[in-house]
Amino acid sequence: MKNDYRNTVYGVPKKNIINEKKTLEEKIKIEHPKVKIIYNQINKKDSEYNKQFRNIYNNKCAYCGITTDVISSELFEVDHFICESSFNGDSINAGKINNLVLSCKKCNRAKKDFIFSKI
């Protein structure tokens, strides 16, 4: 990750994204034990969970690296890395935190329902 073009000398690279996402998921489950689709909690722009999720990604788009220093945080979205349609109607698994990334609106719209093939 050292040579990743999204990491600059001006930004601190994140190393524990997976662990930080798990911690946030645990917090949500403790505070909202009946919630099954984590996406619905994180996606609310004015929520504390959304703010924490953005901080996990250093307020950077996971795809292009643009930050909220350059464009408004209103132009960022929580994206399903593997598109919802790939889950055949299983919103619970599609909305799990390990399938969510922070994306700028431009990248999210360009990605649409891109389907990743298995390697």
Q: Which residue ranges define each predicted feature?
A:
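Internal, well-ordered alpha/beta segment that forms a basic, Gly-enriched binding/recognition surface
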Residues: 108
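Conserved active-site neighborhood of enzyme catalytic/cofactor-binding cores
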Residues: 105
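Short, charged surface segments at domain edges that flank catalytic/cofactor-binding sites
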Residues: 2-66, 87-94
